[in-house]
Amino acid sequence: MSCMAAENAQTAPGPVALTASLPDPGQKILYVHEVMPVTPGPLTLYYPKWIPGDHSPDGPIGDMMGLEFSANGQRLTWQRDELDRFTFHLTVPEGARQLDIRFEFPSRDRVTTNLLDLTWDHVALYRAGSPTKDQMFQPSLVIPADWHYGSALQTDTRDGKRITFKPVPFNTLVDSPVIAGKHFRQLDLTPKGSSVHRYLDMIGDSAAAIAISDQQSADFHRLIEQAQALFHSHHYDSYHLLLTLSDHTAKGGLEHHQSSDDKARGGSKMFADPAHFMLDASLLPHEYTHSWNGKFMRPKGLWRSDFEQPEKPKLLWVYEGLTVYLGDTLTARSGLWSPETWRDALAYRAAVMAHRTGRAWRPLVDTTIAVDYGAPEAWANWRRQNDFYREGELLWLAVDMKIRS
C-alpha cells in the first residue's frame, strides 16, 4: 500500500455533508462548506482533476478561492502538493472527529441572475486513498426560494431555499449535475407503457427561452422512442436531459449516466429560431447516446477508480466517433433533423476530413492522446483538431456499411 493510501485508509464512517450555496446569483459565486468525518492523523485530499467526458486534466482548480480547513473550532495549516496542485495535505489534530472545509468558487459561465448550472466536481474535495465509489456524500444546494430545479439526484427534503438530496457515492455525485432557475419547465418524455421515466428539464433567462413548440416536443418524445428501438435496453432508473437556454453561459454538452448537461449554442433562441434549432438539434441525442456508449459501456483506459489517475484516451474514436454517428442517426430518425440535413452534415464532415492536410503527418489515434479543446484555430488544418469526432464518425459509417454489405 502506498504511503498516501496508508494515511487515508482510515476512512471515517458516515457521509460527507456537502453544501453549495448561491446566496446572490448576481455575484456568481458559490460558497462551499464540507463537513467530513475524520480521525486524527495525516490526511490527503484531492480536488477532481480528470472529469469523465472532458478527456483531459482540466478540473478548474485555479478558480478555487478562500480555502480554509478547521477542526474543533481551530483553523488548520494546510499545504498544497509541490508536484500536483490538485492535492492538499494537512494533519487532523487529536480529538477531532470532523473536518470543516470552506472555499468559494466563482462560476462565471454557469450562473446568471436567473439560473444555475451546477456540476459538483467544481465544489468538492474528496479523500485520497480509496475509490470514489466508496466515499459517500450527502449534497445540499441553497438557491433562491422561488427557483425550481432538475437533476438525476433524488431529493430528500426541500425547506425554502435549501434542497437536500439523498446520499450517493462521490463518483455518482460528480456524474449528477443540477440545473436550477427562476424560469424552469419539465417535459415528461416517457414512452407509453414504460415505467422508466425520461424528462427534458429546461432553464432559461426568460420564459420565452423555454417556450418549446408542440412539434419540437413531439420530436424529443420520438428521440426516446428511437433510442429504445436502436439499443433495445436501458440501464438507468430514470433519465434527465438537462438543457440550459441562456445567452450568458458556456455552450456545449457533457454526458452522464442518468442525465446530460446540455447548454445550447443558440442560447435563448434555440427553440424560437429554426436555424439555431438545426445547429443545436443533435446536441441532446449525442449526449443521450453517451449513456450507452461511454457510461454504461466505455473503452478500456477511460475508467478510473478516482478523478486523480490519468485516463488513457486512445479509444476516443470509439467513445466519441461512434457516439457522433449514432447520435446523428437518432437526430434524423426522431425528426429533429430532416434526412437532407443529416446528409448535408455528413457530407460537410467528409469534405473537411478529405482536405485535412494534417492527416499526412498525424494519425487519428494521436488526436485522441493529445486532446486539446482549447487549441487555437490558426493552422488547424495542418495541426489537426479533435478529429476523433469527425473522422471517427466516418470510420463508423464505413464499419456500418461493411456490416450491412
Task: Give names to the regions the model predicted.
Residues 297-306, 310-393:
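Acidic/His/Gly-enriched intrinsically disordered linker/tail segments
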Residues 394, 402-405:
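C-terminal, non-catalytic "cap/extension" segments appended to globular domains
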Residues 188-316:
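Juxtacatalytic substrate-recognition/specificity segment
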